[in-house]
A protein has these predicted regions:
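Acidic, Mg2+-coordinating catalytic module of metal-dependent nucleases/exonucleases
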Residues: 93, 141-208
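Conserved RNase H-like, two-metal-ion catalytic cores of nucleic-acid enzymes
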Residues: 2-86
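Short, cysteine/histidine-rich loop/knuckle motifs that typically chelate Zn2+
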Residues: 215-219, 242
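Short metal-binding segments enriched for Cys and/or His
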Residues: 237-261
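Residues immediately within or flanking Cys/His clusters that coordinate Zn2+
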Residues: 209-214, 237
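Conserved DEDDh/DEDDy metal-dependent 3′-5′ exonuclease domain
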Residues: 59-144
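Short linker/helix segments within small regulatory modules
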Residues: 226-237
Length: 261
């Protein structure tokens, strides 16, 4: 059932995603905390690689996974397939993705001589960055926040599972990794939708549609909710009756088109 005030229109394509990477392998002289030089990296474990990428659209459908193949271990194909998905999205969202996932995916494009997507960063957002900006939790791990907000936490993985996958010792670990990856994405999606009314995301529904509506859910069922000042600018703020929260603001007076920002 559609929310009041939300027309039957083309919806923006919001993509949630998460990657899992291969560990590095190095020769060391002792155990414990130490600095490992790049010259100590073993031949088959000298650079990062992507085992799988899970993704889900913001339509409630289950997450899917693109993996490198238990036997083949071909990450080039993973990036090629995922880039086809990215190009369909209006916004992509991960957790700690600005610092981790995006850079790893960009690196694999470079290493595999695949077409670059330098504008990708223009339409990404990061669940962890938004949570750290607007909230205070004892831990910002996905496992902790997932449990705290009723999603059950992450699928349990052990470091041995990564070894079993990389060395092709146990296919069950590979299957578990894919399930682990998909659960992370589904939790990212659920958490994003839960926190969204409390934050100001990079992606605005009002900007997407190019008119006057809620920046979060695209509803037009709004009411005025007080006046605020920022510097010398006066703003009319709005409340969204559809999702029951902040809907955006408009500068007063404004000679420009009325688009909530």
């Amino acid at each position: 059932m559609s929310k009041p005030g939300l027309d039957a229109e083309v919806k923006p394509k919001i993509l949630f995603y998460d990657i899992e990477t291969k560990p590095l392998l190095a020769y060391i002289w002792r155990l414990g905390e130490q600095v490992v030089n790049h010259k100590q990296l073993a031949k088959w474990g000298y650079r990062y690689d992507i085992i799988c990428i899970s993704y889900a659209w913001n339509d409630g459908t289950p997450a899917k996974v693109i993996h490198w193949g238990y036997e083949e271990q071909d990450s080039r194909r993973v990036i090629q397939e995922f880039d086809k998905i990215i190009k369909q999205a209006d916004i992509t969202i991960g957790k700690n993705s600005d610092r981790f996932d995006v850079k790893h995916i960009n690196s694999q494009r470079l290493l595999h001589n695949l077409p670059p997507l330098p504008d990708w960063m223009d339409y990404t957002d990061d669940l962890e960055r938004q949570i750290r900006k607007y909230f205070a939790f004892p831990s910002y791990s996905l496992d902790y926040i997932s449990k705290e907000l009723g999603l059950g936490g992450k699928v349990k993985m052990e470091f041995q599972d990564w070894i079993d996958i990389v060395e092709k010792l146990n296919k069950k670990s590979f299957i578990k990794m894919c399930d682990y990856n998909k659960k992370d994405v589904e939790d990212t999606r659920a958490l994003w939708n839960k926190i969204q009314p409390h934050i100001k995301p990079k992606f605005s529904m009002a900007t997407f549609y190019g008119d006057f509506r809620c920046i979060h859910c695209a509803s037009k069922d709004l009411k005025k909710d007080g006046v605020r000042f920022k510097g010398k600018t006066k703003y009319q703020t709005f409340f969204c009756k559809a999702h029951g929260g902040y809907a955006g603001r408009v500068a007063i007076p404004s000679e420009t088109k009325r688009t909530i920002g």
